[in-house]
Amino acid sequence: MIKSKGDVNILLNFRHNINGEDLIIAVAQDHETGEVLMVAYMNREALRRTLETGTAHYWSTSRGKLWLKGESSGHVQRVKDVLVDCDGDAVVLKVEQEGGACHTGYRSCFYRSIDGDELKVREDAVKVFDPEEIYGDG
């Protein structure tokens, strides 16, 4: 678990404002392989809860609320380290990913690549769960 000795929120620049919420960009990366799993936003509360619990929390810009990654699916991210960029407006969460990071069922949200004028599923993309079994048909 990540231990914080103080309020790291004052060290960061929550300068990305979406719908009145001050946010930082958060990149989740597999702590062993370096694979980029997902990109999301964090507000101050999401960062605080992440540091206190050792599990990734994010701010949903579409739902306008805090969410624990994996709260519906069980596919949580255990945070091993937090890196901060030079401007203090983005973090990389080095995580141990349980199951898939992407709501589409893939291990990573970055399962497609650009091929000419098309998006193609990468040959090495790994689908680890069926989203309909977890989320229903929506």
From Swiss-Prot:
HAMAP family: HisI. The gene is hisI. It comes from Methanothermobacter thermautotrophicus (strain ATCC 29096 / DSM 1053 / JCM 10044 / NBRC 100330 / Delta H). Keywords: Amino-acid biosynthesis, Cytoplasm, Histidine biosynthesis, Hydrolase, Magnesium, Metal-binding, Zinc. One of its GO terms (cellular component) is cytoplasm. GO terms for biological process: L-histidine biosynthetic process. InterPro entries: PRA-CH, PRib_AMP_CycHydrolase_dom, PRib_AMP_CycHydrolase_sf. The keyword Amino-acid biosynthesis applies. This is Phosphoribosyl-AMP cyclohydrolase. It is found in: Cytoplasm. The lineage of its organism: Archaea, Methanobacteriati, Methanobacteriota, Methanomada group, Methanobacteria.
